[in-house]
Curated annotation (Swiss-Prot):
The modification 4-aspartylphosphate is found at D72. GO terms for biological process: chemotaxis. Residues 199-388 form the CheB-type methylesterase domain. Involved in chemotaxis. Part of a chemotaxis signal transduction system that modulates chemotaxis in response to various stimuli. Catalyzes the demethylation of specific methylglutamate residues introduced into the chemoreceptors (methyl-accepting chemotaxis proteins or MCP) by CheR. Also mediates the irreversible deamidation of specific glutamine residues to glutamic acid. The active site is at S213, H241, D337. Phosphorylated by CheA. Phosphorylation of the N-terminal regulatory domain activates the methylesterase activity. Signal peptide: none annotated. This is Protein-glutamate methylesterase/protein-glutamine glutaminase of group 2 operon. The gene is cheB2. It catalyses: [protein]-L-glutamate 5-O-methyl ester + H2O = L-glutamyl-[protein] + methanol + H(+); L-glutaminyl-[protein] + H2O = L-glutamyl-[protein] + NH4(+).
């Protein structure tokens, strides 16, 4: 999985204290003004620069030295997708959030940006009039800046631990007592053994449910490459926090990665093995009984956990169909979506696997499940596929 903040900065280490420095790069003066005002109103972040083109951002990056960049895709002189690799070449740990309107072309470019090292993307309102009243855009952007920036700070703290205090003069030095060294935990990291897991269900799973958010597209594409045997024999349903158009592109990427059929779910279609069903942007995906079959039910109701689609509606609806014969996986993402649904699955006799903190872009959703004590396993992304395959093959350990 490629993320923007892997590795060390070549332009100086990121600050471990003080507000996050945010560089805003957009050719719309209205958008720049709105984002500047929103960022400036937060106590833990500040506007480092407000620039009109990608070329300005590349040329001034060393002087500005931001922690986070909000980068528009369509700009004069140098567009966002062209500026992205140049910015990361100068500052490898820069967190870059791509901003684009909801067109198919921009969605495809956003996916390309993720593969080139962007940390995340955010859909931008179609017009400046919409932007000024875009509460969702405001909320989501600030949360992405905050959570992605916090992860950068934690990684920097681990990479550069505080210097030890100077040794006292020899006369004042205490007698030496040998003790095993204990590494200091990362900021906000959980101590080993602090998380408890429960046994996997003794019931054979009949369906695989997956929920994800920030960092999810990369994680999902990596995971489904390993799940061919499961997809062939069991239904696989995925909810990824994503807007319309973006989910269309994601489904196409999942089909290519898995080499199995994958598409946005359609209201009323039967749920069968052999394909991946993805919740479409802007709709909750549930499953319902339809005679002797199981069918998709799309829900245009209010957001759940600030999200639409949300993971909890899928998880809870599946219990009425498969009872405890459910394996659910919660991947990287902000917030706690999936935790309540995961609790219900466990109460019904099913199992939950969460992605671990080290391999998550943001350890919100999987962390909430892990801290709730509902997980049978908390694993790095590169171990989840093999575990899922074993569980569906009959291994309950």
């Amino acid at each position: 999985m490629s993320v923007a903040f892997a590795g060390n900065s070549t332009s100086g280490s990121s600050r471990e204290a003080g507000p996050l420095r945010v560089m805003i790069v957009d050719d719309s003066v209205v958008i720049r003004g709105l984002i500047s005002r929103w960022v400036g109103a937060e106590h833990d972040m500040e506007v480092a620069a407000s620039l009109r083109t990608g070329l300005e951002a590349v040329n001034q990056l060393e002087r500005i030295n931001p922690d986070v960049a909000v980068l528009d895709i369509e700009m004069p002189e140098l567009d966002g997708i062209s500026a992205l690799p140049q910015l990361l070449a100068k500052k490898r740990d820069l967190v870059i959030i791509m901003a684009s309107t909801l067109t198919r072309r921009n969605a495809e470019i956003s996916f390309k940006a993720l593969s080139l090292g962007a940390a995340d993307y955010i859909p931008k309102p179609e017009s400046t009039r919409e932007a000024s009243a875009a509460d969702t855009f405001h909320h989501d952007l600030i949360q992405k800046i905050r959570h992605l920036g916090a992860r950068l700070r934690r990684k920097a703290a681990v990479a550069s631990p505080p210097l030890a205090p100077a040794s006292p003069p020899p006369a004042a030095r205490a007698p030496f007592v040998a003790r095993p060294a204990a590494p200091a935990p990362a900021a906000n990291a959980l101590l080993p053994g602090a998380l408890s897991t429960r046994p996997f269900s003794t019931l054979a799973p009949k369906v695989l449910l997956i929920g994800s958010s920030t960092g999810g597209p990369q994680a999902l594409m990596a995971l489904v490459t390993e799940l061919g045997p499961v997809i062939d024999r069991f239904p696989v349903l995925i909810t990824q926090h994503m807007p319309p158009t973006f989910t269309t592109i994601l489904a196409e990427h999942l089909a290519r990665s898995s080499r199995r059929p994958a598409a946005e779910a359609v209201d009323g279609e039967p749920v069968k093995p052999g394909r991946i069903y993805l919740a479409p942007g802007g709709k909750h995906m549930r499953v319902v009984r339809s005679g002797a079959d199981v069918a998709i039910a799309l829900d245009d109701g209010p957001a759940v956990n600030f999200c639409k689609p949300a993971v909890d509606p899928l998880f809870t609806s599946a219990i009425d169909i498969w009872h405890g014969a459910i394996l659910s996986v919660i991947l990287t993402g902000m917030g706690s979506d999936g935790m309540r649904g995961g609790k219900d699955i466990v109460a019904a006799g099913g199992s939950v696997i969460a992605q671990d903190e080290a391999s998550s872009v943001v350890w919100g959703m999987p962390g909430a499940a892990a801290n709730a004590g509902i997980c049978a396993a908390i694993l790095p992304l590169n171990q989840i596929g093999a575990k899922v395959n074993r569980l569906f093959a009959g291994d309950r350990s």
